[in-house]
Amino acid sequence: FVKGDAAMTQDQIYQNIAQRTGGDIYIGVVGPVRSGKSSFIKRFAELMLLPRIKNEAQRARAKDELPQSAAGRTIMTTEPKFIPEKAVSIDLKAGGSFRARLIDCVGYMVDGALGHEENNAPRLVKSPWFDQAVPFDQAAETGTRRVIREHATIGLVVTTDGSVAELPREKYLPAERRIIAELDEIGKPYLILLNCTEPDSEPAHALAAQMEEVYHHPVCPINAVNLTAEQLNNILQKLLYEFPLREIAVSMPSWVTMLEPGHWLQSSVYQALLELAGSVHKMGDMTRGKPQLNCANTTGVTLTGMDLACGQVQLRVGIEPDIFFKILGEETGLPITDEASLLPCMLELAKAKAAYDKIKSALEQVQATGYGIVMPGIEELHLEEPEIVRQGGQYGVRLSA
């Protein structure tokens, strides 16, 4: 289990994602054209995949398959491409392995980008999804949709603030909105990357915050060309929090669960928990702000742990201290309002129980046979002084009580 946004090692991140995706980590990198998708894939592969390929020949071949990237408005990627061509099998230090690769897409067209037309007419290209040549725009969008729906297990949307390809931010918005809407419809986990020349600047962070409000998804400002391994680890860890929440394990004072089924306190707490469960869908929903429990009888709910590999979160529910005494009074009919009144009641009940235990067996006999005998306890017996008696040629000891 991890707490909140506790940092994980690269192995832990890979292992958790691999468990969530059944051992295949296929990252579909999608978004508008000329936003930096190929640059991101190249940097990701160089830092996160290639160093983990043990076979030197395989590593060299994978390096040759990395996409080309360049500045300007000309579209560099012309068809979807798996990077590397064959999935890389990566062994984890803690045991187990997974297969990983990225999928580079052409992306959705952006007004002002170059390369999708020839002689002022749509550029026709051949695509594995069509029997005949089709316009570049159509092939690009179809390929992107097929990659996300049929191949990728997780998604990364790469868009930009307009500082990376000589195209203003406004040009990217239609394509950006379309791809995010489609990802929401498909339901696969994804993260939004905002490619900027200055990702640490105030405008970049302000735009990222604005996008998070619009898309209701985490947005990470990055510089795709200069990403570090630590930044990529953070991206993957954030991506883990976009997986579905499968189970909520709740702990609360044990006496609450011992109440009769349907008790008013149980009903109010359980109903509040059901409402909370209905309002969260992803692991990240539990970490973005404190979980809220709408129940007047509780002191709140605390996130105590998360199992990112299987989608479980652990919550602890606190109960108002006065509620315990209130329910104790209701259930017993005794005037119990606090600890001071509880102790005398407990002492009195203990004496009553001791007295009852003496006659308990006799009462059971009465119910069974009509009469019962109350046997005295050891503390009630008085032993007389033993007396030696003689009867004929025999001696004995007479005990009287």
Feature map (PLM): residue ranges:
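P-loop NTPase catalytic nucleotide-binding module
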Residues: 128, 153-155, 159-163, 168-169, ...
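Inter-motif core of Ras-like GTPase G domains
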Residues: 113-166, 182-183
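Conserved nucleotide-binding/hydrolysis micro-motifs of P-loop NTPases
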Residues: 106-110, 161-164, 197-200, 225-228, ...
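P-loop NTP-binding site
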Residues: 5-14, 19-21, 25-34, 44-47, ...
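Charged helix-capping and loop-helix junction motifs
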Residues: 171-177
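Conserved catalytic network of the ASCE P-loop NTPase/AAA+ motor domain
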Residues: 91-96, 147-151, 182-186, 213
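Conserved G1/Walker A P-loop phosphate-binding module
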Residues: 3-131
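Canonical P-loop GTPase G-domain recognition
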Residues: 178-191, 196-263
